[in-house]
Amino acid sequence: WGSKSSSNWNQAVSVMTSKNGGSFYGNDVKKGGCFYVEYDGNKDDLELILQSWSGGASWAKVSISESGSANGHRYIKCSYDNCVSAFGTSDFSGKLDQVHVSAKSGNITVYSVCYIY
């Protein structure tokens, strides 16, 4: 994707799920994996948000399970369990409609968003 930037309380990245014509597959979100976001900005000054208009939590902010540095950038990981806890269900293929990465109080540049195992 290259990189995407945003300032406080705006989305740097918004990806629709495949059931809505987008490129992210909700059925990829499985136990044992996590969302991985690589970015520049203040430490942990971003949010992973799972959005649903199909019966899941409408705007679920997922807690960060790990953060650090890699490839000259910062990263966060949000575990499967944290995703289920925030979203209220494990039915990501049926109820997840969009994934967002949002800046909190500062500016961020996002380089990568993926679900890893």
What are these regions (language model features)?
Residues 1-95, 103-117:
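Extracellular ligand-binding interfaces
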